[in-house]
Amino acid sequence: MARYNRWQNRAMMEEVARLGAVERMAPRGAHWGSIQGTMAHLLWADHVWMSRLDGWEAPHARLEDSAGFVADWSEYRSKRQITDARISRWSQGLSEADLAEDLSWYSGTAGREMTVPRAICIVHMFNHQTHHRGQISAMLTAAGVLTAPTDLFLMPDLVG
């Protein structure tokens, strides 16, 4: 899923780059407001989850401020690429034992301590990406941008 996530994030950045700053930041009725706001929220969420899963520094921004996590488009693109590369390297080192462990943290969203199997947390992180990329895809389509295929079986390194 890390490879798929990286592939899709690259494609989405290329698609979003066709828009100007005003179009990227335009309110579009999505939960995180704009295309760029939704993308920033996803980057923020990856950093939150990786702080729990692999000891990364947690973002200082709170959930409600996550749409502004990275406001500059060039900085966003750089951080997204670095983040995806780090997640890919981390995922390659996971073992069955790692996946079988529980992960405990305080969830601000749930308002309590959580203990969940690490494998479920990892699936959630990638599922969260897919959920919001679907929203971004819909916003891009509404803005007249043709989006690339998102089917997992079409990922280039899976297609023979």
Task: Identify the role of each PLM range.
Residues 96-111:
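Carboxylate-rich helix-loop segments that flank metal/cofactor sites and access channels
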Residues 57-99:
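Helix-adjacent hinge/juxtasegments
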Residues 2-66, 108-160:
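Short, contiguous alpha-helical
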Residues 1-2, 76:
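Short leucine-rich amphipathic alpha-helices used at interfaces
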